[in-house]
Amino acid sequence: MSFLFFLVVLISIGLWVGPCVADNPENRCIKQFAKTNPACIVHCKYNLYKFTDDNYDITDQHINKFTDVLIKNKAVDGSKKSQVQEHLKKCAEESLKKTHGKNCQRLVEYYSCAVDNKLIDYFKYESAINSYDRSIYTPPYSG
């Protein structure tokens, strides 16, 4: 019985302390890149959100994740899912052409194209991403 109590206390402490020593993606990325390479903040966040990867790729899987987050957090209506996916796919292709390769600037271009205030409203996007960002905990940047 005392072992079970000890185990419950240990798990409770872990769940309580975990978020206290963790950071959300936006804060972590700002701490990591604000002084050295601000253009990489977007890539860092999108990588932690799983909207891209370490190699700056934007695959269908990444586009689907981005779309699902926007719909779940009410930035766009679910009935427009296929339109959003097509829009993001077009933005991924355009961002690669504009930046002549895979780099942090590609994700800045992708973001700028995606949040066009036509299909994806800036303020709804910000609200959705902020909600999603607060739901994710990452190890704090220790650089």
UniProtKB/Swiss-Prot annotation:
GO cellular component, one term: extracellular region
Signal sequence bounds: 1-22
Cell compartments where the protein resides: Secreted
Domain of life of the source: Eukaryota
GO biological process: suppression of blood coagulation in another organism
Protein keywords: Blood coagulation cascade inhibiting toxin, Hemostasis impairing toxin, Secreted, Signal, Toxin
InterPro entries xrefs: PBP_GOBP_sf
Tissue: Salivary gland.
Keyword Lipid metabolism attributed: no
GO MF terms, alphabetically ordered: odorant binding; toxin activity
Chief localization: secreted
Function (record text): Inhibits the intrinsic blood coagulation pathway in the host by blocking activation of host coagulation factor XII (F12).
Record text on subunit structure and interactions: Interacts with human F12 (inactive).
Protein known as: Ayaconin
